[in-house]
């Protein structure tokens, strides 16, 4: 399984992740990205059909704010750093 979360502290609201993976990432009122699957907690497995989109977003993030892991983040984007 794969999990994803956005580090809102480093996100610059560029819009790249939502363009790459609109079924996973959306934006708050300030344009800061978050994961829609679990309100950015990183605890819901990303469906297999969305893994390619997620990896495109992960690789395309200019600030490395998109985090991906094999275990849940439990709400902490820096859990595995």
UniProtKB/Swiss-Prot annotation:
InterPro entries: 3Fe4S_ferredoxin, 4Fe4S_Fe-S-bd, ET_Ferredoxin. Residues 2-30 form the 4Fe-4S ferredoxin-type domain. Signal peptide: none annotated. [4Fe-4S] cluster binds at residues 11, 14, 17, 61. PROSITE patterns: 4FE4S_FER_2. Its cofactor is [4Fe-4S] cluster. Keywords: 4Fe-4S, Electron transport, Iron, Iron-sulfur, Metal-binding, Transport. Disulfide bonds: none annotated. Binds 1 [4Fe-4S] cluster. GO terms for molecular function: 4 iron, 4 sulfur cluster binding; electron transfer activity; iron ion binding. The keyword Iron applies. PANTHER family: FERREDOXIN (PTHR39163:SF1). Ferredoxins are iron-sulfur proteins that transfer electrons in a wide variety of metabolic reactions. This is Ferredoxin.
